[in-house]
Design a protein with these regions (language model features):
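N-terminal export signals
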Residues: 2, 8-30
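N-terminal carbohydrate-binding accessory modules
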Residues: 36-77
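Short, well-ordered coil/turn segments that N-cap beta-strands
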Residues: 45-47, 74-76, 110-114, 176-181, ...
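The substrate-binding groove and active-site-proximal loops of carbohydrate-active enzymes
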Residues: 49-57, 84-98, 145-162, 251-264, ...
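Short, acidic/polar
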Residues: 58-70, 288-296, 356-364
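Aromatic-lined substrate-binding rim segments of carbohydrate-active enzymes
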Residues: 67-68, 80-138, 271-276
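Polysaccharide-binding and catalytic clefts of secreted carbohydrate-active enzymes
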Residues: 144-304, 318-319, 325
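Carbohydrate-binding surfaces of carbohydrate-active enzymes
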Residues: 235-238, 311-711
């Protein structure tokens, strides 16, 4: 995969704006636009309050009443058409867009804008009926059937051709309608399926390998295929990671995951190019860190990022994590929360607990405060058929206000209250970032390196755990992809990234030399690019930069091992890099009990103006948080970062600056219980103008906007 950077994506957007992207009259069916040009830089200059709307499922007679009710609730955007392929192309080659043209005309007249979606998540039956070769196949050889969604193989040429045909026709027929402000690619790419093992996918796998390695001997050498007689003489012999009596080579398993996920991202780029033939409007995709795609690479297909989230009230921190991730994904652009539930999530066989009163408005306020431009619901009217009957909606299936209807009104009120503040301010640049790596995710899915009880079982859980640790301490932070630039940061935390590439190491070294502090967390550096064990040093190139020698990489889980870091003692668990330090490297954490006693598990080395910190093992047990908090506080201080405030659990402070240079904090209580937070001495309530003194008291699910000085 080629290097993708935040700076590169931002520069591309700036170049588009400078050159002037092609713009055609809305509603025109003139010649195609230049498919090579991205959409122009854009911002709606308002907050979006949106909902998914499915006119193909309900009587036309309901549309006018729906629109009037949307207006009364402050809904200003609808998203549509992502599941309507069979409505627009009921038989192959016969197109009818009248349902959507009619609705879009009415929406435009009412001042409600539209996000138009490509319908490729739910292909019509004519595409796959009688053609099992066009369907997704899992690792057990089971072929997915028409009847749900994501059943087709995007690797099959006939499927791709049909997808691009409907997208191009949609773009030509609907893409310049005056109601449309943006496009969404597909819907929740690979939410229900993972690797594709169809014949078409495996044929493309062999092409991918050939492009990557050029010659089969290079693959054999990189993967060490003489083990268990896995040696190959042609790329066509290399199997996909289908079910075997035991396990495939780790190199093969991880490579197949990367192939499939990169291929999906490239399919998204191809969708974008189909849209661009007739529309230059911004493009997004409703992503989620759980989905089986290459998230960073997929951003090349998008002009702004968006995501879906269905947290319960107890899972509110997931909203902060995803906002911090997708805000940084395409720098300089807004992000949207494209789907969330008004009261509870649900599908056949399960439903989540219902939101407490007030939580939805708190959720929306958090998204808007953290830089989100859009906050949207799934869905307007409860499904009367299908697989998601229990899911909440703004209106019930019998067209009455739902249990969440009043909460939507509260969101509209919160939006109207915050909108003038947010449009007059910009989010302050976070000084701390946590690294998210798609490659690391694939490797850890192949080889779960920490099996202790209570530790996150998924890679995203590890990253979210670190994010929450920083969030709960009251630091302003974000999450950056592996290939992102490190500009503007003072502290970088990279947990659980087994392979550290040359390019990442060079960027990190430059970041440190300029004064940054890099904390490389447990497992980082313990594997090579092709998911092999380094043979030159325990942590590969990272070890040389850190000025250490790794004596052992060993599992501490269940051994009772302990360590001391900066005066704090804790049990340790998971995999540990036990090290000795070279001259110029300081030991700051030592194993105090168990195997490897006396060796270092945390070191720091000054490089230029900054420091590289190696954290070789994770604290565990009762004093886990004490050790991690000490580590973060200490190195944040070394990097010149101060906490915004001593925030109790559940309170989030979002620092922003208005157009006059004044510091504005949005303080949110994401819990139902009352909370209080200490403030700078000079703090004024923006809405009342009153001085707040040294303490701010927050009722459950409330937000305060304050102006502060001296911070």
């Amino acid at each position: 995969m080629s290097s993708i950077s935040r700076r590169g994506l931002f520069s591309l957007a700036g170049k588009s704006a400078a050159l002037g992207a092609v713009s055609l009259p809305l509603g025109s069916l003139a010649g195609p636009v230049n498919a090579a040009e991205p959409a122009p830089y854009y911002r709606q200059n308002k907050l979006i309050h949106g909902v998914a709307y499915y006119p193909e499922l309900w009587p036309d007679a309901d549309i006018d009443a729906d629109i009037a009710e949307m207006q009364s609730l402050g809904i200003n955007v609808v998203r549509m058409a992502e599941f309507a392929w069979s409505t627009m192309e009921p038989t192959q080659g016969n197109f009818d867009f009248s349902v959507f043209k009619n609705v879009m005309d009415k929406m435009h007249a009412a001042g409600i804008q539209v996000v138009l979606c490509t319908p490729t998540a739910t292909p019509p039956v004519w595409l796959t009926h009688g053609h099992p070769e066009r369907c997704h196949k899992n690792d057990k050889g089971e072929i997915m059937s028409h009847g749900a969604r994501q059943h087709a193989s995007y690797e099959h040429p006939a499927v791709r051709k049909a997808c691009f045909t409907i997208i191009e026709r949609m773009s030509r027929e609907l893409g310049r309608h005056p109601s449309v402000i943006a496009w969404q690619l597909d819907n929740e790419m690979k939410a229900h399926v993972s690797e594709d093992y169809s014949d078409a996918a495996i044929a493309n796998w062999h092409k991918w390998l050939k492009k990557r390695f050029k010659h089969i001997d290079a693959l054999n050498k990189a993967w060490g295929t003489h083990i268990w007689s896995q040696y190959y003489t042609a790329f066509e012999q290399v199997p996909a990671s289908v079910t075997t009596p035991f396990l495939h080579n780790a190199s093969l398993i991880t490579a197949y995951k990367m192939f499939c996920r990169e291929s999906v991202a490239d399919f998204m780029v191809a969708q974008r190019d189909s849209i661009r033939k007739y529309s230059d409007l911004p493009i997004t995709h409703n992503d989620n860190p759980a989905f089986n795609i290459h998230h960073e690479r997929s951003m090349l297909a998008q002009d702004f990022a968006s995501y879906d989230a269905y947290p319960t009230a107890a899972q509110w921190s997931a909203l902060a994590f995803r906002s911090d991730l997708y805000r940084a994904a395409i720098p300089g652009k807004p992000f949207w929360l494209m789907e969330t539930s008004v009261a509870h999530n649900g599908w056949l066989g399960n439903h989540q607990p219902m939101h407490p009163e007030g939580f939805l408005a708190a959720e929306a306020s958090l998204i808007y405060a953290l830089g989100g431009e859009g906050f949207c619901y799934w869905l307007w009217r409860q499904q009367r058929t299908g697989a998601e009957l229990p899911h909440s909606a703004v209106k019930s299936a019998w067209n009455a206000p739902s249990i969440g209807y009043g909460e939507v009104k509260k969101v509209a009120a919160a939006k109207d209250r915050l909108e003038p503040i947010l449009l007059d301010t910009t989010l302050d640049a976070p000084p701390i970032a946590i690294t998210y790596s798609d490659h690391a995710r694939a490797m850890i899915e192949t080889e779960g390196l920490d099996k202790r009880s209570g530790f996150p079982s998924r890679y995203r859980g590890v990253i979210e755990m670190w994010h929450k640790q920083v969030l709960d301490l009251g630091y302003h932070r974000e999450v950056r992809f592996e290939n992102a630039e490190l500009d503007g940061l003072k502290l970088l935390i990279t947990p659980a990234m087994p392979y550290v590439s040359d390019s990442f190491l060079l960027r990190a070294k430059d970041f440190i030399e300029q004064g940054g502090v890099w904390i490389a967390g447990p497992v980082t550096g313990t594997r090579g690019k092709e998911h092999t064990v380094p043979t030159d040093a325990g942590l590969g190139l990272l070890e040389k930069l850190a000025g250490v020698t790794t004596q052992y990489v060993m599992p501490l889980t269940g051994t009772g091992a302990t360590g001391e870091l900066l005066g704090v003692s804790s049990e340790l668990s998971g995999w540990c890099a036990a090290m000795t330090a070279h001259e110029g490297t300081q030991v700051v954490g030592t194993l105090t009990a168990g195997r490897g006693k006396g060796l270092a598990f945390v070191t720091e080395r000054r490089i230029g103006k900054g420091k590289l910190v190696l954290l070789g093992a994770m604290p565990h047990g009762d004093n886990k948080d004490g050790m991690l908090n000490t580590l973060i506080h200490h190195y944040a201080g070394e990097a010149g970062i101060s906490r915004l405030a001593d925030t109790p659990s559940g309170v989030v402070i979002v620092p922003r600056t208005n157009n006059r240079g004044q510091k504005i904090w949005i303080v949110l209580n994401m819990l139902a219980d009352k909370r209080s937070v200490s403030l700078p001495k000079e703090a004024i309530d923006v809405f009342t103008g009153k001085s707040l003194g040294g303490t701010l008291s927050l009722d459950g699910y409330t937000q305060h906007v304050i102006q502060v000085t001296g911070v």
